């Protein structure tokens, strides 16, 4: 096998889809042309963009002689720019330089029909009845085929071999043949370009779907695509192809050759067709690029929007997550604080805490009493200071715990207010001592000298003992009575002070000269009258003033003593006693109320029990009640006694029934008698 056949086989192995497997057993040989002479026609189109064209009729059985295509342009990059659009005007004009009769090597003539556009806009497919007649001598598979008029020859491949080799290929590969045609950059050839419409192109080939049946390319310098009509005996092959143009198909499939004479007109047509092709391709490519750029920009904008939304969602999620974390922490802290508050409240209200504070107050009172002794105060000054600091720390801790447990409710209790005031005074005392130890000059400041007065307020801590002795009922009642008597006592003390002021003014005006030591001014006079409330030294006042000739002081002093001592002081005592009595009565009444409540609760429980029993009895049937009644009344009788008692009861019931009938009959008789007498009186009157 020569070089051309080997190239052909390698091409079909690379493009196995270029042949239709339906022609696997075609009986007629067909030469495989390689080169074309310049003045010979023969056009083959295998372009899905442009459809099929009617091919020249060829005579099988001799040497095929074809025109060699003239090279019009040179394409450096034939794979990207190989658009072979054939001129529609040239095809309509039927430009061809093929001779009508060419001698065949086997003694037969090979008539070639004029190339025409199959399925064109004006003429349909024309079929020559003399087309493809077989001559006397058939093709021999081993005979070489040559082109006498061409510049080169090759060992051709018979039609049978061609079909045997190509029809075993895959139909899918056959369809891919048009998409994978490659061109060499050194290939130069002439083409006639023509824009084709999306029309149907017939292909006559024995009712087989034959796409690219003879579309093959010589793997030499010039790729040629042919599409021919063949008449094999009586078999006529006819096929209609429908194709739609696209940019990729224009670039790889629209390769057709139309044999034209090398003329200036053909060159112009070819150039115009190429320009039209490149313009259409550039427009399509520009539109595709614009659409792709729009899609890319839209996709980028959508991606940016998606990223922004995702970032916003992430930020919102982070904020919500942070807020949830803070809320969770706050809830946990609040829960812990609430639990701590409840624990502290239970601690401050416990009996052990009250007992501990009571012991501390008692010890503090003992220390205050011990500090009154000069010798003990001098020797145990350091110890007393340490103990005072410990007591102060305990008082502060108590106040803080109660403030945490009760909050502002701590100040609603007067005893708590007293405790807080004592604690503040103790803190001031401690601060004054510390300032005195640091700087004596600063301690002598007027402000701290005023605060030093409150140091004596430590004695009020002893009152805490009364507060801590609340476990004693009687003492608690006395303290409650005193607190309840304060308004009345305050009113009485106000009257006493008013009376004291009036008597001070009068006594100073009358006895200033006779007794200047006691009645010199209003303050000395007030002090003298206040000491007289105890009835002390009033006789000495009378003696000194009588010696000075002021004997009339006696009635004034007597009036003052009666008003102040016998009236107002007794009023205070009366108020206290009355309040104590009221407190006792309230206590007794409270006890009675508690007893009555207990009795009422017991009665309520009994009534509920009776109601429950009544409900249980109500649920019992009448027969059960009768049986219960009988068992209660006659449970201790024998059977004979019960029978006799039953008969007795029956007789008693019968007697009562007859008595009832007798009464009713007697009533009727009485009515009749009364009516008779009334009727007789009426008749007698008439």
From Swiss-Prot:
Keywords: Calcium, Calcium channel, Calcium transport, Cell membrane, Cell projection, Cilium, Developmental protein, Differentiation, Flagellum, Ion channel, Ion transport, Membrane, Spermatogenesis, Transmembrane, Transmembrane helix, Transport, Voltage-gated channel. Pfam families: Ion_trans. It catalyses: Ca(2+)(in) = Ca(2+)(out). Residues 1-351, 405-412, 470-487, 578-686 are cytoplasmic. Residues 1-15, 128-142 have a biased composition (Basic and acidic residues). Activated by intracellular alkalinization. In contrast to the human ortholog, not activated by progesterone. The chain crosses the membrane at residues 352-373, 383-404, 413-435, 447-469, 488-510, 552-577. GO terms for cellular component: CatSper complex; plasma membrane; sperm principal piece. The keyword NAD does not apply. This is Cation channel sperm-associated protein 1. It comes from Mus musculus (Mouse).
